[in-house]
């Protein structure tokens, strides 16, 4: 049971909380550059100024989830073209921060570098313009950042926040003119956002939450706790809601396979392997192909 706790404890953007990253190998750096170049081409080819981008930072497939962490790739990010603005947990200060990360570095955060998955959601211009402007407004973006982090923050809780929750609330501020987190969550409820329901193996899992400083149960409804459920913000639930709200939004997934980089319109199913199927596009052929 404890083995189930570790991935969920870090699922919402902390990516193995406070472990020291090893230095990437030359091959891994080359892969990340190749992968990020393909993503950049997809975003620029659509005339985008912004894309929601998600990675498989941790393996959540046992809960029916492919992606664990999302941010906004911004064409005009002062940190560099298409750098990803995101919430991350600052281990040195013990607090969440906003972080602009280069696209290649974001790609390197994949759970399995040799077969990583990335998702892009390309929004229509009428949606992306307001979100792009707000994301680059440091004062307003920081105003939605809560100082207390929880990986399993309740989707409509105000006491804690995780990275994907901040992203949803940023969207509410951009499109619903919400001025604070409470207003943002009220607007999200009105617009049909419900987060993602994770069905846990059983109630004993909840007792183990006390072992992690990154998990909190205080705000989760009693009926969810009784049923061993957690309702939190994860990339898939956020992308599903955005596609319902903006039917013209385009979902594209890219993964690394032995054949090369594979692009799939509409995305991969959570349990799907990275294998070329009819309708897919091989973006970059691998030099390992025979």
Language-model regions, residue ranges each:
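Cysteine-nucleophile amide-bond enzymes
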Residues: 11-290
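Sec-dependent N-terminal signal peptides
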Residues: 1-2
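N-terminal signal peptide c-region/cleavage motif recognized by signal peptidases
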Residues: 5-10
